[in-house]
Amino acid sequence: MEIVAENRKARFDYFVLQEYDAGMVLVGSEVKSLRQRKVNMGDAYVLEKDMELWIHNLHISEYNRADRKNHKPLRVRKLLLRKREIHKIAGNIKVSGLAVVPLMIFFNNKGIAKIKIAIVKGKKLYDKREAIKTRDWQREKSRISRREV
């Protein structure tokens, strides 16, 4: 598995409740841009329309060697999942306080571009502060243990 991009801010801003791997409907120049890691998914989110999942604000830069048939960087892309997974996710989207955001884009062992999406719940400010405290404490513990050895 080759990781192309990771949305680390999503793990900081949200509690991840459930994760899914989904395929994406892409054109050739988008796949080539993904291989060059020219993607930004900081503001991306997933919406349901007509029992299909669509990802919005996923910026895949234009492939510089493509001609006039190049793709639009911010176009809405369809996600490919099993029907029962789509029903579960769509039901969770309708629950207030829950959202679906992308966590990472990767190429699987067969070389197919996939996206890991998650059902998330927003963190409060004090939860974020607690996460920062624990992260800093883990970092400090590792520094102390390296000095003692």
From Swiss-Prot:
Belongs to the SmpB family. Required for rescue of stalled ribosomes mediated by trans-translation. Binds to transfer-messenger RNA (tmRNA), required for stable association of tmRNA with ribosomes. tmRNA and SmpB together mimic tRNA shape, replacing the anticodon stem-loop with SmpB. tmRNA is encoded by the ssrA gene; the 2 termini fold to resemble tRNA(Ala) and it encodes a 'tag peptide', a short internal open reading frame. During trans-translation Ala-aminoacylated tmRNA acts like a tRNA, entering the A-site of stalled ribosomes, displacing the stalled mRNA. The lineage of its organism: Bacteria, Pseudomonadati, Pseudomonadota, Alphaproteobacteria, Rickettsiales. PROSITE patterns: SSRP (PS01317). Pfam families: SmpB (PF01668). One of its GO terms (cellular component) is cytosol. Keywords: Cytoplasm, RNA-binding. Signal peptide: none annotated. This is SsrA-binding protein. Its main location: cytoplasm. It is found in: Cytoplasm. GO terms for biological process: trans-translation. It comes from the Bacteria. Coiled coil: none annotated. GO terms for molecular function: RNA binding.
